[in-house]
Amino acid sequence: MPMSAETTSLPAALPIALDAAGGDHGVTPNVEGAVQAARAGVPVLLVGPRVALHAELGKHAGSASLPLTVVDAPDVIGMDEHASDVRSRSGASINVCTQLVKEGKAAAAVSMGHSGATMASALLTLGRLKGVDRPAILTHLPSKKGFVTLLDVGANADVKPVYLAQWARLATVYLQVVEGVQDPTVGLLSIGEEDHKGSQLVLAAHALLRELDGHSIHFYGNVEGRDILQGTTDIVVTDGFTGNVVLKLAEGEAKVLFGWVREALGSRLQTKIGALLVRGALRGLAERMDPSTYGASILLGVRGLTLIGHGSADARAVKNALLRASRAYEAKLIERLEAALTPQDG
């Protein structure tokens, strides 16, 4: 069935640290999304400029009684600044978020702000899981069978074959413990289904994934671009450059298609009447294809939960990101990943 962060709202033992001024629209959607998540039972630490956050909270009736706490961090790394700024700005809001996770005061760090800064902060503050050379950004796309998991979608443009094998293992555990997929299948993105097709990277990665098949992963084989949204496999692994292109292409195509549908249904009286009849179905389809339904992408491979959202995120996306972080924490994702990566004796 289609996955949605909105379907489950588990209370976390620890609050989620939200980079509450990050993103294109500042504190407004972040605070509104946090209020919605708090009403669903998820406690949130709002990390950012104290005065602005309290002023925004004041616009939401009843927010004072919700599990929301403001953590003052007036320094915010802007979308047009350098990711490397996290090294010299220890008090930046995203650094405060990841530090709270490291100290065990927050279950996860969530940011709709500078994605590069978020990745850099997570790596510098939390470090990598043992057995992981490079973390990857994992996201979900709607598919014919519900949703498909795609990684990497931007953390690593240049990769080695072993990275893809590691990411397949990480994504397998993620789907098992967070999304409840019992035996997720892994596909390797290539230009043909045949084992001998693909770049040198794909050929080498294919051999590694085949070795893991039946042990830590269920390897389907190569998949092509057309297979992704068909849901041929539960997981598709690729390098971050290709994955990011696939993600942006899918998002852009969805917008174009819905634009065409709106134009077609609104062009004549008969079609306007027909539009009223199919409005419910179209609304459900639009929700499945809306990135805000999935909230945020997870940075897999660091020693602490870190979720990265769109800079243009609205309140719904923020809420769903917080709910997803809560689910991952309750599922003990980091502990399960560490266990899966630990060599077994015998």
Curated annotation (Swiss-Prot):
Provide the species name: Deinococcus geothermalis (strain DSM 11300 / CIP 105573 / AG-3a)
Record protein name field: Phosphate acyltransferase
Q: Where is the organism placed in the taxonomic lineage, from the top? A: Bacteria, Thermotogati, Deinococcota, Deinococci, Deinococcales
| Location within or outside the cell | Cytoplasm
In terms of InterPro entries, this protein maps to: FA_synthesis, Phospholipid_synth_PlsX-like
**SUPFAM superfamilies assigned to the protein according to its UniProt record, in alphabetical order:** Isocitrate/Isopropylmalate dehydrogenase-like (SSF53659)
Please give the family membership noted in the entry.
Belongs to the PlsX family.
UniProt record, GO biological process: fatty acid biosynthetic process; phospholipid biosynthetic process
Question: How does the annotation summarize its subunit structure?
Answer: Homodimer. Probably interacts with PlsY.
Report which reactions are catalysed by this protein: a fatty acyl-[ACP] + phosphate = an acyl phosphate + holo-[ACP]
Give the EC number.
Answer: 2.3.1.274
One Pfam family, short name please?
Answer: FA_synthesis
- MF GO annotations: phosphate:acyl-[acyl carrier protein] acyltransferase activity
GO CC terms of this entry: cytoplasm
Top class in the EC scheme: transferase
Tell me, in a sentence or two, what this protein's role is. Answer: Catalyzes the reversible formation of acyl-phosphate (acyl-PO(4)) from acyl-[acyl-carrier-protein] (acyl-ACP). This enzyme utilizes acyl-ACP as fatty acyl donor, but not acyl-CoA.
Tell me the pathway: Lipid metabolism; phospholipid metabolism
What HAMAP family has UniProt attached to this entry? Answer: PlsX
